Every structure is written in structure tokens, then in C-alpha cells.
Amino acid sequence: MVNFVHPEEMYLFVESIRPFEVREVGSPKWLEVHEMILGLSQQAALELSQNREEEVKEFLISRDKLRVLIHEAYCVTLWKTRVLPHLLEIDPNPQATFLIYTVLYHEAALVALLDVCLYHPSGCETLQESVLDLIDYCAQAISQVIGLVSMGYHENETKLDVDEAVLTELERQKRDFIYKIGLRCISVLNYIADNVTLFHLSAARRLLVTHDIPWLMADVLSFRPWQRKTSKGIQKFIDEKWTNVDDVTKIVKPEAQAWFCVRQLLLNPQIMENYAFNEARCKQLHKLLGLMHEPLLDQLPPLIELKVFLSRLTLSGNTAKTQPLLLEDIPQIQEELLKDVEENGGFYQIAQDQDSVFLSKNKENICALATRLSKAYGTDLLCELEQNMDDLKMGEAKDAGAGGDGDTDHTCATCQAKAKKKCACCKKVHYCSRDCQLKDWPQHKLVCLKT
């Protein structure tokens, strides 16, 4: 059985996860933990895709590591927004950017793990007061996605120029991760809304008053960041990549999660009794009625009840209520991180201290780090899993009577030997091993990135 993390390694990996400060990002110890988080994230996704026992989720929850994951997500957010700009001021065109990319990827892996764990109420229960920090984080991430969509980001098919400046490429990578993380956060907020009664009243207030999540989700559903129109037709964001769809009305996961989040909040009398349905909110929520067409309700029947509620709300008009005085908890994680930054000279000082790490020009160090990270990302294993999935789909198609010409022998693009693995990006070029793939990458990337 293929695994990214073997059962005997699981306990060690989970126990090794610890909170880092912003100044520690990119350090050897940070990279070591990054490799473990990456492996756990890949293993968790594998367990879900194959309907296996969710061991990663169980270990993270039982060892109370979800707060650490939230802490680390905030840590990377502060680094990429407050430290990275200073690093690029020092050197606008760094010689190697893969370590910066690694930090950006780290945040996506953390959010993916939170998404897996919080699907279960037991995961939500372990959050305790850190749920406030997570709500703030998710609301900010979703708002950033709305900002990108409003600027037409998702309508632009990425055609990367090979001669593109490094700074522009980094900005593109940052936006790609903002997009993926933001859509994941829709799912996370839905799980929190579904289990909001497990938390202190401060969590409900954070959702409804501080961030007005029903309003935010109405914006998300109006902008539809999971759908775009391209020269190839309508595409939807499925499994973290854009895919052509024949049926435009078919609901994808982020869309369903956004609808359910609105439903869980608006139809929960325990938390909505103090939500002021003023004129502005009624007008905003009324937009949802125009989106609730028959194909949507056929696929998501629980939304029928929400449609009835919104229709009555439109007829009843303004029902604003006085907000009661409520003492609430204050999010702590970001404040703790900022306090450590101040005690260590501020963000610019951290950037100067990390100059030798992220802006290194030592070719030996760069090559050694590249080798280490390439192993962490498990190119061979990823290709093997993708090939297994492709073979499975091909077999299902044959069983269904689709026919075919049988297995096709592919040759390695580097050494011309028989090859079963293929590039994980374009899925068009085959290789017999990771070594051959790495040798061919300088030439293949010109075609692969354009594809």
C-alpha cells in the first residue's frame, strides 16, 4: 500500500510539529518540520481519496496540534506580507526562489490539514479559544479571494512568459496560493458554523458581528470564484485545478460549502436571535434568492428551507435589534507573534537576518537545499499515485464498455527507456525515474509551464 507517511512514522511526525516565530521561518529546524507537515498533508489527502482510516486526523486531534497549525498559518501570513517585501527590496531578483515558494506552500499544507480535521466535530472541540483566531484568518483569506476575483484574476488564463521577471513570477505564485487557500477557508468556516454551539458565545459573535459571515458568503456566491470563462469554454475549480465542465449547473465543493455555511448560520435560532437584519443586510441577503435556481435546489435540497427563510425575510423587511452587551475573548495567536517580532527588532530586522537564507548566492547551498526539498515533495511517489488513479479510471472506462486500444508503452523523454511515470504538471511527457525528470526539466519547463 502506497503511503507518504508510514504508520510507524506517524507519531514522530505529529509530535514534532511545534510553533515557530516569524524570525525562525526558513531555518533548518523549520524546514525539517515543513517536510513532516507536507508529508502529513499528502497522507491525509491520500487517506480521504482512498476511503481509508483517517489516521492523520486522529493523531493531530488526539495530540492537540490544531492550535499549532493555526499558529503556523498566521506565522507564514505575517512572513509573506511583512518580511518578504523587505527581502525583495534587498534583492529584487533572487537567484533561487524555491525556498520562498516552499514557505508559501507551507501555508497551503497547513490549511489543508485543518480542512481535513475540522470536518469532524471532535476536531472543532479541540480548538477552544483558538477558534477566534481561525475565524479571523479565514475571513481575511476569503476577502482576499473576493478582491482577486473583482480584479478579474480568475478570468485570466495563466500564460507564463519564460522570460518573466522573478518578482512577477513570485507575485503570481502568491496569488495562486491566496486563491487556493481562500477557497479552502470557505470549507473551514462552514465546519465552524456547523458546530458553532460547541464554542463560547464569542465565536458566534465573531462570525456574525465582527466579520458578518452571512454577508461575506453572499459576496462569495455572487462572485463565484470557483468558475471562469476561457477560450476553451466554462471551467470550474475542482480538486484545486481548473477543469472544463459540460454541465455549468453542476455544483462544486466550495460552492456547496458556501451555501451550507449561510444556511447553518441563518437557520440557527440559538445564535441568530441577536443578529440585526437591518436594511443593508436584508438587501445583501436578498441577492441569494436570485441565485437559488432549480438545478441548485435539486442538488442541495436542504437549501429549500433557506430559500423559504429568505423569502419571508424579504416580505417582513427591517427587523433590526439592539445588540446586547457581551464580554468576549480576544484572539491571541497573532498578537503573540507580533510581540515576538517587536522584541527582535521588527520585520525589517528579521528580513536582514534572513538575507543569507532566502537570498543566498552560494550554488552549493542552493543545490543541497533543492535536493532536500525535491525529496520532500516526493516527485516519484506523486507520479506513481497519479498513474494509479489514471489506470483505475481507464479500467473503469473499459468495464463500462468504453473500449480502448489497451496499454500504451511510453518512452522516457531523457533516456528513451520504457517509462510509466509522467510529469505531474502537464501529464504529457513520460519519464522512467525522477533523475531523468530532473535532467530534462531545464528544457521541459519551457513547454510545461506554458501548458
From Swiss-Prot:
Q: Which segment of the chain is annotated as a signal peptide?
A: none
A Pfam family this chain is assigned to: zf-MYND
The protein's location, in the record's own words, is: Cytoplasm; Cell projection, Cilium; Dynein axonemal particle
Expression across tissues = Specifically expressed in cells with flagella and motile cilia: chordotonal sensory neurons and sperm.
Molecular function (Gene Ontology), one example: zinc ion binding
Protein's name according to its UniProt entry: Zinc finger MYND domain-containing protein 10 homolog
Upper classification of the source organism reads:
Eukaryota, Metazoa, Ecdysozoa, Arthropoda, Hexapoda
Does the UniProt entry include the keyword Transport? no
Coiled-coil ranges (or none): none
Factors inducing expression: Expression is dependent on the transcription factors that regulate motile cilia such as Rfx and Fd3F.
Known function: Plays a role in axonemal structure organization and motility. May be involved in axonemal pre-assembly of inner and outer dynein arms (IDA and ODA, respectively) for proper axoneme building for cilia motility.
Give binding positions for Zn(2+) 1.
Answer: 412, 415, 432, 436
Name the family.
Belongs to the ZMYND10 family.
What gene is this protein translated from? Answer: Zmynd10
Positions annotated as zinc finger (MYND-type):
412-448
Q: Which UniProt keywords apply?
A: Cell projection, Cilium, Cytoplasm, Metal-binding, Zinc, Zinc-finger
Residue positions annotated to bind Zn(2+) 2 are 423, 426, 444, 448
| Biological process per Gene Ontology, one example term | outer dynein arm assembly
| CC annotations in GO | centriolar satellite; cilium; cytoplasm; dynein axonemal particle; neuronal cell body
* Disrupted gene: phenotype observed: Sensory defects and loss of the axonemal dynein arms. Flies display defective proprioception as a result of malfunctioning Ch neurons caused by inner and outer dynein arms (IDA and ODA, respectively) defects. Males sterility due to immotile sperm.
Domain of life (superkingdom): Eukaryota
